């Protein structure tokens, strides 16, 4: 795989970032510093970089939306890459509070999801299930045939710094409450736009690099070429004006029912129906209980249908079985945090289509597995029923043992809220590397994940002596305390040790 340096050279980054390529009217002298500049820069970056497109929630389409976790990822990368607050480590929780402030100041708003006619409390959620929309973009939910695409930065350029009229004092209070102080102007880096190709290459290289540190892989070919082997789930393009009217009405009935229920279980199940074929959805609608308030019958119908569909289709994560084995091995050895990070990295490498379908299914599995929820089978625990029904929908490979598959599936269910987040360490590494490219430095020097620590010659010499001494003392202690050795044998070994390492012997036993 080509290195980032080679990719950057091929794309002529130095020319891309020359003064001639800067935006019209750009001038360092014109740039404001401090709290106001940081705030405006965050808004501009969020509006131009977060993925805004048509999304679905409970089978209802919402135009021009982005998800909460992606907003946090964009702002986190922006703050760490540009070092607005110096070298201070910024935890993800503080970025979430920044997003809450952006929502409080009407930069963006939550896409309203009504439950019995009431709006949910406008609290920002770092989740891939929460939808938001910029307030500068008109609501277009009622338009049909709108393309599901990412909008260009120009769409927001005129509104980038007009989202809210906020005084500098208020912004300074905001950063102070977060224990963050904007660095002085010489340390603030003027961000220049990098090619998406370079950014994606950096993300992929660093994600794979870190994954290789956590998981022992015998072969790298499958990992490096994983984009070619990801199974593509059969997806039918269902636009309102292109589907059979009867099928669309059946989906509409289920959507209306879901919108009327204040039930997380039913909402999660209906979200999964998006991936079921039309005929299965028609069957669900036609067999719907005559008493809609019998939610137990509704849940039984939905669970059986979703389970039946995923038992017959291609597993979502069936490729890269060696990674699955590696993650399961970490779990067996009790290294849960490392297993979680490895899972986050693995899912970061997935294509967006598979990732979204897997997110919905895993969310439904986690809700259905809750022991306080609807009893799926009288004599079985919900958690075990869900594992048994959906394990093969996630991983079904003869190279992964059943025990490891079960362990991995249960782990995914228990951590479904965290597995789709990007590790903070990866964010920081990528930001540092992108900053090096922007400044024209070698991106591979002193950046990225490394497998050993660089030290100078004198430090190496002293470190070697200390390590050797520590190991010799440990060996001497083992000989001295070994009760299995006879007195004659122990005396002989101690004599040999004293002859070859008198200083260590004296230090251990004294004069």
Swiss-Prot record:
Protein name in UniProt: DEP domain-containing protein 7
Q: Where is it made, tissue-wise? A: Strongly expressed in liver and to a lower extent in kidney.
Which Gene Ontology terms describe the biological processes this protein takes part in?
A: intracellular signal transduction
Question: What organism, scientifically named, is this protein from?
Answer: Mus musculus (Mouse)
- Record's superkingdom? Eukaryota
Q: Give the protein family.
A: Belongs to the DEPDC7 family.
**All residue ranges annotated as the DEP domain in the record:** 46-136
Q: Show the Gene3D superfamilies listed in the entry.
A: Winged helix-like DNA-binding domain superfamily/Winged helix DNA-binding domain
């Amino acid at each position: 795989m080509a290195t980032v340096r080679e990719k950057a050279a091929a794309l002529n980054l130095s020319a891309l970032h020359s003064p001639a390529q800067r935006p019209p009217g750009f001038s360092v002298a014109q740039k404001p510093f401090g709290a106001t500049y940081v705030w405006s820069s965050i808004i501009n970056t969020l509006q131009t970089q977060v993925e805004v497109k048509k999304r679905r929630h409970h089978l209802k389409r919402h135009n021009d939306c982005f998800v909460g976790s992606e907003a946090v990822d964009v702002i986190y990368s922006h703050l760490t890459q540009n070092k607005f607050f110096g070298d201070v480590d910024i935890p993800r929780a503080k970025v979430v509070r920044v997003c809450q402030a952006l929502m409080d100041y009407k930069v963006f708003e939550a896409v309203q999801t009504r439950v019995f006619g009431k709006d949910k409390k406008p609290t920002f959620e770092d989740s891939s299930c929460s939808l938001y929309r910029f307030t500068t973009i008109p609501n277009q939910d009622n338009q049909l045939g709108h393309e599901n695409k990412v909008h260009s930065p120009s769409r927001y350029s005129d509104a980038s710094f007009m989202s809210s009229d906020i005084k500098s004092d208020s912004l300074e209070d905001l950063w102070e409450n977060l224990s963050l102080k904007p660095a002085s102007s010489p340390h603030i880096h003027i961000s220049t736009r990098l090619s998406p190709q370079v950014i994606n290459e950096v993300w992929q290289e660093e994600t794979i690099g870190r994954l290789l540190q956590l998981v022992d892989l015998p072969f790298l070919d499958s990992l490096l070429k994983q984009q070619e082997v990801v199974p593509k789930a059969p997806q039918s393009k269902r636009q309102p004006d292109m589907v059979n009217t009867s099928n669309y009405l059946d989906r509409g009935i289920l959507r209306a029912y879901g919108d009327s229920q204040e039930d997380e279980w039913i909402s999660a199940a209906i979200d999964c129906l998006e991936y079921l074929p039309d005929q299965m959805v028609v069957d669900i609608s036609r067999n719907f209980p005559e008493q809609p308030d019998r939610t137990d019958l509704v849940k039984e119908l939905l669970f059986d249908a979703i389970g039946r569909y995923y038992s017959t289709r291609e597993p979502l994560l069936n490729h890269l079985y060696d990674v699955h084995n590696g993650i399961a091995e970490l779990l067996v050895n009790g290294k849960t945090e490392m297993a979680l990070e490895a899972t986050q990295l693995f899912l970061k490498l997935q294509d967006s289509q598979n990732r979204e379908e897997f997110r919905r299914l895993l969310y439904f599995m986690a809700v259905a597995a809750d022991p306080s929820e609807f009893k799926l089978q009288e004599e079985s625990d919900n958690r075990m029923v869900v594992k048994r029904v959906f394990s093969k929908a996630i991983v079904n490979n003869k190279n992964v043992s059943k025990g490891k598959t079960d362990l991995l599936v249960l782990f995914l269910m228990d951590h479904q809220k965290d597995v789709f987040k990007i590790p903070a360490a990866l964010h920081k590494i990528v930001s540092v590397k992108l900053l090096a490219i922007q400044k024209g430095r070698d991106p591979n020097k002193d950046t990225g994940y490394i497998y050993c620590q660089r030290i100078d010659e004198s430090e190496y010499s002293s470190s070697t002596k200390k390590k050797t001494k520590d190991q010799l003392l440990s060996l001497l202690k083992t000989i001295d305390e070994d009760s299995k050795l006879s007195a004659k044998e122990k005396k002989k070994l101690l004599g040999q040790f004293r002859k070859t390492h008198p200083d260590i012997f004296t230090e251990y036993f004294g004069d």
